[in-house]
Amino acid sequence: MATAMYLEHYLDSIENLPCELQRNFQLMRELDQRTEDKKAEIDILAAEYISTVKTLSSAQRVEHLQKIQSAYSKCKEYSDDKVQLAMQTYEMVDKHIRRLDADLARFEADLKDRMDGSDFESTGARSLKKGRSQKEKRSSRGRGRRTSEEDTPKKKKHKSGSEFTDSILSVHPSDVLDMPVDPNEPTYCLCHQVSYGEMIGCDNPDCPIEWFHFACVDLTTKPKGKWFCPRCVQEKRKKK
């Protein structure tokens, strides 16, 4: 029930994602078109300048070159806007992916705890059944063949149920949630895994890893001031 409710909430949270992505992609296409139009305008202005440069006065040359420079500046502005929009789009999708990764990790841990608890209860139940069965055997001695035959199906039924329970409990939670990983998704941290949950960046600009999961570096909250990863701290000590 809780899983179904979570799925419903998660689907609600990404309901507007396709529309937002479509809007951003449309804006990027428009910026592309504006850039191409500006580049065509620059080509025309450059051709005009080259063909008339000998007949233009100094003031006219400066004015013409300023038009070309202005067109170049506008073209760069469109390109910068497109890059910024692409980064926003990536962050928007990555936010949902990181949330899903974190929720899946919590769900897997919760599932493992529940199955461990079920395994403990099942072991106790089997011990109780075994003791009860031995007691029934002692009390049924001398009752005759008919009583013994009537007990046989019940014993088989208990055995079958126990085997079924064992087969369920033998399934590892990670097998249930085992999903293929995108080979193109970048990996981070000392664990070389994809980004998920809370992460912190190393303040060493030359750090080869850059980003780390809180749990992998024994953090629960973001520390104040600059923070350096264990590898960079160790390298710094070696240099001393």
UniProtKB/Swiss-Prot annotation:
Cellular-component GO terms for this entry: histone acetyltransferase complex; MOZ/MORF histone acetyltransferase complex; nucleoplasm; nucleus
Organism expressing this protein natively: Mus musculus
Positions annotated to bind Zn(2+) 1: C189, C191, H213, C216
Quaternary structure (record): Component of the HBO1 complex composed of KAT7/HBO1, MEAF6, ING5, and one scaffold subunit: complexes containing BRPF scaffold (BRPF1, BRD1/BRPF2 or BRPF3) direct KAT7/HBO1 specificity towards H3K14ac, while complexes containing JADE scaffold (JADE1, JADE2 and JADE3) mediate acetylation of histone H4. Component of the MOZ/MORF complex composed at least of ING5, KAT6A, KAT6B, MEAF6 and one of BRPF1, BRD1/BRPF2 and BRPF3. Interacts with H3K4me3 and to a lesser extent with H3K4me2. Interacts with EP300 and p53/TP53. Interacts with INCA1.
Residue intervals of every PHD-type zinc finger in the record: 186-235
Cell location: Nucleus; Chromosome
PROSITE patterns (UniProt xref): ZF_PHD_1, ZF_PHD_2
Protein name per Swiss-Prot or TrEMBL: Inhibitor of growth protein 5
Originating gene: Ing5
Annotated positions binding Zn(2+) 2: C202, C207, C229, C232
